[in-house]
């Protein structure tokens, strides 16, 4: 395309706007050789271990990334599936499908890696005892499991996730999810304000 001058910083801003600054949307810059690159994905929906070892690490260790990019990417990463190539403007739709988009400065394509996390549990078996007695991370992971299950059902960049820490002592993580353009913005604002004001530690016991 003609707008081949892709600036990673400007692209990061554009992507964050596409995802309404959703708290589970992550942009991760990476320098490969002399190129500024960027990964964008939804946290909680990708297999982080495979992502790190098969994609990020080989790229970090690569001396350079040159055109033809698709061919060079396929030769560099340890990812065996086909890397899908889409125009940059289609990237948010691919990210909303829980895939990872990779961008290279001065290239107007997005390279899509599918490293989706397998669903960890069915809805309806909340592991209450481990949440209450176990480590805090378990609880944060649980939130990610729940939000990722919703992401799998509503595959849209307009699905926004905002997370909060509530309770002065328990610092419980709470997530609000809504669809931009469908949910009433004022209602969302009111709900978020009410959650921010929660100061009582009433979430400690769920028995």
State what each model feature region is:
Residues 1-207:
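Membrane-embedded alpha-helical signal segments
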């Amino acid at each position: 395309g003609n707008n081949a001058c892709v600036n990673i910083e400007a692209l990061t801003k554009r992507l964050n706007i596409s995802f309404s600054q959703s708290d589970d949307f992550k942009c991760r810059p990476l320098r490969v050789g002399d190129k500024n690159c960027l990964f964008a994905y939804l946290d909680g929906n990708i297999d982080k271990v495979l992502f790190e070892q098969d994609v990020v690490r080989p790229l970090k260790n690569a001396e350079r990334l040159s055109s033809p990019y698709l061919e060079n990417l396929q030769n560099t990463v340890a990812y065996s599936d086909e890397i899908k190539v889409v125009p940059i403007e289609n990237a948010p739709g691919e990210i909303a499908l829980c895939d990872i988009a990779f961008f290279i400065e001065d290239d107007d394509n997005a390279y899509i890696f599918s490293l989706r996390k397998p669903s960890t549990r069915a809805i309806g078996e909340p592991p209450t005892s481990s949440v209450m007695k176990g480590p805090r991370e378990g609880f944060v992971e649980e939130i990610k499991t729940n939000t990722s299950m919703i992401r799998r059902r509503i595959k849209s960049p307009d699905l926004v996730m905002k997370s909060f820490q509530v309770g002065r002592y328990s610092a419980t993580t709470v997530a609000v999810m809504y669809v931009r353009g469908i949910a009433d913005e004022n209602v969302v604002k009111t709900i978020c304000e009410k959650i921010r004001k929660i100061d009582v530690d009433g979430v400690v016991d769920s028995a």
